[in-house]
UniProtKB/Swiss-Prot annotation:
Regions crossing the membrane: 91-113
Gene name tied to this protein: sigG
Membrane topology of this protein: Single-pass membrane protein
Subcellular location: Membrane
Recorded coiled-coil stretches: 41-91, 172-208, 292-340
Residues bearing carbohydrate: N25, N28, N36
Keyword DNA-binding: no
One Gene Ontology cellular component annotation held by this UniProt entry: membrane
The name this protein goes by in its record: SrfA-induced gene G protein
Signal sequence annotation: none
Alphabetical keyword list: Coiled coil, Glycoprotein, Membrane, Transmembrane, Transmembrane helix
């Protein structure tokens, strides 16, 4: 018979277990403190290495950006120098061609359009002279274009010596980069401002019919009934704003945190009615002001026409005065021609063909000017005579239709004198 094996039971006391756990915790704490100190040293070294690498990368990036700026400016200067040389050669050829064409036309003018002798006088300007004036204008325009092409280089400023410093001057390089970034931002802001101006112009073109009508009719308004766009906008805002104590048909979320008013869908018909009423009021006031202005203008025109008729009755002796002025003008011209002859005789001495040609040019110019003055005087005198012949009354004319002198002494002794600014002849 097999005897049963006995198993020994392991009896563990709680005190022994507590001691074992304490010893294990002590070993763990010592190990953790040692591992934490070594890990902290490693992290500090990694942080310093990483910071050095970042500083080095930033320094390299700044140097690279400076090199790119220098290369960009060098390329721009080279391109502008090429454009300048090309424009210079092109404009020189254009100037040479204009000089050649001008000389050819001037040669044809001097050969074909010789001035006529002193009698008869020609007041019209030769064709070649007009061509010369047009060529002169074209040549001046090309010269201005050519001179403006040299001003392109002034826009680009090359890098100064202070901007190409060694790598150690990090603060100075940072200032340079900030300046360049600020300049680029200013250029972008300028472009945005240009876009805003274009958008504002488009918005002005898309104005409503009411604003357009008011803008067209404010010129005819009386100063007491003057209306401008700001007044209309203020009136619209005042009428659209609800009363604080009254019940409103608007939603709860009409006013947001910034107290900005947003009308709901229920309020749109009311707003439309108020705007239409305001439009009608404004248009009625405009029409009333225009009617008053028309009445005033009619009265002024009536008064002016009455004074005009009174003044025209005074001007019966005007043709004789014009004839006297015409004769005195002819005498002055003859005297001037005589003085020219005398001066030329004293200065030039004996006449030759060249001197006669110079005289011919000078007398052509003098005759052209004098004939134009005489022609203008004759036209004004004829116009006055025609108006007087129309407006003169029948009892003050002869059987042949010639005007008689009108007794106008009683008009000159009136108490109410006539304003000279209202004379319309």
């Amino acid at each position: 018979m097999s005897t049963p094996t006995r198993t020994k039971k392991l009896i563990v006391s709680p005190t022994s277990v507590r001691k074992r756990v304490q010893n294990q915790n002590l070993t763990n704490t010592t190990y953790s403190t040692n591992s934490n100190s070594s890990r902290y040293r490693d992290s500090e070294e990694n942080f310093l290495n990483r910071q050095q690498q970042e500083l080095k990368q930033l320094h390299d990036q700044q140097l690279y950006e400076l090199q790119e700026l220098q290369e960009q400016q060098i390329n721009e200067i080279e391109e502008l120098s090429k454009q300048r040389s090309n424009t210079r050669i092109r404009n020189v050829f254009k100037v040479l061609i204009t000089i050649l064409v001008g000389s050819i036309i001037y040669g044809t003018y001097t050969n074909q359009f010789q001035p006529n002798p002193i009698e008869p006088f020609h007041l019209t300007e030769p064709i070649g002279q007009t061509w010369l004036h047009s060529l002169k204008d074209i040549s001046t325009n090309w010269y201005h274009i050519w001179s403006d092409s040299f001003k392109d280089l002034a826009r680009i400023k090359p890098l100064s010596e202070s901007q190409t410093m060694p790598a150690g001057h990090r603060l100075h390089e940072k200032q340079i980069l900030e300046k360049t970034l600020r300049r680029h931002q200013q250029e972008q802001d300028n472009n945005n401002n240009n876009k805003k101006t274009i958008e504002n112009q488009m918005e002005r073109m898309k104005r409503t019919d009411l604003e357009r009508a008011i803008k067209e009719k404010t010129f005819f308004l009386d100063p007491t009934h003057y209306v401008n766009e700001e007044m209309i906008k203020q009136e619209i805002e005042r009428q659209l704003k609800p009363h604080p104590g009254a019940p409103t048909p608007y939603n709860k979320d009409v006013y947001n945190s910034q107290n900005i008013y947003y009308p709901s869908s229920d309020a749109i018909p009311m707003v439309r009615e108020k705007i239409e009423n305001l439009e009608n009021k404004v248009l009625d006031s405009v029409d009333e002001a225009i009617y008053k202005f028309g009445q005033k203008s009619k009265e002024l025109l009536h008064n002016i026409q009455e004074k005009k008729e009174q003044i025209k009755e005074k001007l019966n002796d005007e043709p004789s005065n014009i004839e006297k002025e015409f004769n005195s003008l002819i005498k002055e011209i003859e005297k001037a021609n005589y003085n020219i002859f005398k001066d030329l005789k004293d200065n030039y001495g004996e006449p030759t063909i060249e001197k006669l040609n110079e005289l011919r040019y000078k007398f052509n110019d003098a005759a052209r000017e004098s004939r134009e003055v005489i022609k203008n005087k004759i036209e004004s005198a004829q116009a006055i005579e025609q108006e007087l012949a129309k407006n003169l009354k029948k009892p003050h004319a002869d059987s042949n239709g010639h005007p008689k002198p009108y007794p106008h002494h009683h008009l000159l002794n009136q108490e109410n004198q006539i304003d000279e600014n209202l004379i319309i002849v």
